[in-house]
A protein has these predicted regions:
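Core catalytic lobe of class I
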Residues: 1-220, 225-229, 245
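Short, conserved SAM-binding/catalytic segment
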Residues: 231-244
Length: 245
């Protein structure tokens, strides 16, 4: 299921049924620029809708940057759980680097009314084998062969997520996030077939990530230009036979 809506998200969310959403994943406007689309949504009516539509154990994961993130956390401190730090690899702020450090990170604040649905995405890591050791899966001895590499799937998630923000011209929105980062967060808090809501979807990256991971998606965007871009990006990401596209 894909449902894309154009308009004011505070009005559009009123049509979303109670407790029908498994995760809210949104890059809200931070209010740090003079751009028309970068206007902070009032927290009180926003949380009223979020709390109504999200399921009891569903995650509300919201991107931010200071000072916006502090205001966001304080707007619902009772349900705040923790922050992820997104390491963008490519820093921004070169123009003002003589006054402040260049910024290489953004924040993802996670909220929930109860115990979070949690599917930790364990990272694969390579470890060279030296000498005679046993397999962790079947206790069978492995041959002496220094330099052999085995892959382990047991590195627990850490609070810093490293996903490079491309600079190759593929970005169509100034605050567009990497698809892989959104996929990681979606897999962490939902299962296949569950529903993700993005009420400020911009160019549709969350929707693309949902299509790639087999999730249902509800997307909302007020800007007509970006709504059209999001529609096309999400449609193009659907794996359909050519005759259905």
């Amino acid at each position: 299921m894909i449902e894309l809506m154009h308009g004011d998200c505070l009005e559009l969310m009123k049509d979303v049924p109670d407790q029908s959403v498994d995760m809210i994943l949104c890059d809200l406007p931070y209010g740090t620029t003079a751009c028309k689309w970068d206007t902070v949504i009032p927290f009180e009516p926003l949380w009223a809708q979020y709390k109504r539509v999200i399921k009891r154990n569903g995650a509300v994961a919201l991107f931010g940057s200071e000072p916006f993130s502090t205001l966001l956390r304080m707007s619902n401190l009772a349900q705040f759980k923790y922050d992820w730090i997104w390491d963008k690899v490519r820093p921004s702020g070169f123009q003002i680097a003589k006054y402040v450090p260049m910024k290489r990170h953004e924040i993802v604040s996670v909220f929930c009314n109860a115990t979070l649905n949690w599917n930790p995405q364990k990272e694969k890591r390579d470890k060279p084998i030296k000498g005679r050791v046993c397999s962790s899966s079947d206790s069978s001895p492995l041959a002496h062969n220094d330099g052999v590499v085995r892959t382990y799937d047991d590195k627990n998630p850490q609070s810093i997520l490293v996903y490079s923000k491309q600079s190759d011209g593929k970005y169509v929105h100034p605050t567009q996030k990497p698809v892989a980062l959104m996929e990681y967060l979606i897999r962490t808090y939902t299962h296949e077939g569950e529903t993700v809501l993005d009420n400020c979807m911009g160019s549709g990256t969350t929707g693309v990530a949902c299509m790639n991971t087999g999730r249902k998606f509800i997307g909302m965007e007020q800007d007509a230009k970006y709504f059209e871009i999001a529609q096309k990006r999400i449609h193009d990401s659907i794996d359909l036979p050519d005759w259905l596209k």
